[in-house]
């Protein structure tokens, strides 16, 4: 908008009355200096004052409106992304809960019916499609730690889990896998418990990262843990046997001696070192594909397509 000149206050003297009655005759303009009597006053003009530019303000307001719209768009996009993330988390959490519910009572898959296996496989497939870490070997810190086997379709474990002759003496209490991402080691362990003892069989292996999802495992040695015998055997003073009351109080001294002997033997055996043996046959290598991984659940597939569902030690999913 063009600036408007503001004229400062100035004085104009009126002509005398006689002059107004008889104005002087007009004469042609001639070059040269004007006479002092007719020389016009030079009007003093102050510096022009620029009025506010409404156009600039309007443009600024338009830009601010555009910025506000852009900010609203960003906020809306963030809110939408947060809603989508929250929704995805809820879906994954619901799928994990359903999976754990399906695994209940299956004895790590040994007692699962064909219908249950189908439902478990469907839930596993859905979780794999929503894997929050599609490149698990690039998130080795999540792989770190001790993982408890909750389910497997690996038929090679079923004879171990279901052998009736073995269950009369020992029962498989826990199968676990411990991963050390800094040392690139894997330790697989099976713990057995019996009436008066417990023991474990462990394999130690090294692993190499072969792809974002796959690791190659090479087993190096096996370890048979020394049986941990119960160091105290409690024999009651009285008990009922086929309807007849048996009183052992007269033999209390003998029983105490037996308990002390059992405790001594248990401590002696338990203090012995474990038995180690090398693993060097052609079956000492395998690969493992991690298809789902978060901070409490891992799903892996091995040679032949066998699936393993493992839960991180300390996770609420174990309770």
UniProtKB/Swiss-Prot annotation:
InterPro entries: PAP, PAP/fibrillin_dom. It is found in: Plastid, Chromoplast. Expressed in flower buds and floral lip tissues. Not detected in roots and leaves. Specifically expressed in conical papillate cells of adaxial epidermis of lip tissues. Signal peptide: none annotated. Residues 1-55 form a transit peptide. GO terms for cellular component: chromoplast. It comes from the Eukaryota. Pfam families: PAP_fibrillin. The keyword Plastid applies. Keywords: Chromoplast, Plastid, Transit peptide. May be involved in carotenoid sequestration within chromoplasts. PANTHER family: PLASTID-LIPID-ASSOCIATED PROTEIN 4, CHLOROPLASTIC-RELATED (PTHR31906). Belongs to the PAP/fibrillin family. This is Chromoplast-specific carotenoid-associated protein C1, chromoplastic. It comes from Oncidium hybrid cultivar. The gene is CHRC1.
């Amino acid at each position: 908008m063009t600036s408007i000149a503001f004229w400062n206050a100035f004085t104009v003297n009126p002509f005398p009355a006689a002059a107004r009655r008889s104005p002087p005759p007009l004469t042609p303009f001639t070059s040269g200096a004007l006479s002092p009597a007719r020389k016009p006053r030079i009007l003093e003009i102050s510096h022009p004052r620029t009025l506010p530019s409404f156009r600039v303000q309007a443009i600024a307001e338009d830009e601010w409106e555009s910025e506000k719209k852009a900010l609203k768009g960003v906020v809306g996009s963030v809110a939408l992304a947060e809603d989508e993330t929250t929704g995805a988390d809820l879906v994954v959490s619901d799928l994990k809960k359903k999976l754990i519910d399906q695994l209940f009572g299956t004895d790590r898959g040994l007692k699962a019916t064909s219908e249950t296996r189908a439902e478990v496989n469907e839930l596993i497939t859905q979780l794999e499609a929503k894997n929050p870490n599609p490149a698990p070997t690039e998130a080795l810190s999540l792989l770190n730690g001790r993982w408890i086997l909750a389910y497997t379709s690996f038929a090679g474990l079923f004879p171990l889990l279901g052998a009736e002759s073995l269950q009369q003496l020992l029962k498989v209490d826990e199968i676990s896998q411990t991963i050390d991402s800094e040392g690139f080691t894997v330790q697989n362990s099976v713990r057995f418990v019996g009436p008066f003892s417990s023991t474990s069989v462990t394999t130690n292996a090294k692993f190499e990262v072969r792809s974002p999802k796959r690791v190659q495992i090479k087993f190096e040695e096996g370890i048979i843990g020394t049986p941990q015998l119960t160091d105290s055997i409690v024999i009651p003073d009285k008990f009922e046997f086929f309807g007849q009351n048996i009183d052992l109080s007269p033999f209390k001294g003998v029983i105490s001696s037996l308990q002390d002997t059992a405790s001594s033997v248990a401590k002696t055996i338990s203090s012995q070192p474990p038995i180690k043996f090398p693993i060097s046959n052609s079956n000492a290598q395998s690969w493992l594909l991690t298809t789902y991984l978060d901070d409490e659940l891992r799903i892996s597939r091995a040679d032949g397509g066998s699936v393993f569902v493992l839960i991180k030690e300390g996770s609420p999913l174990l309770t």
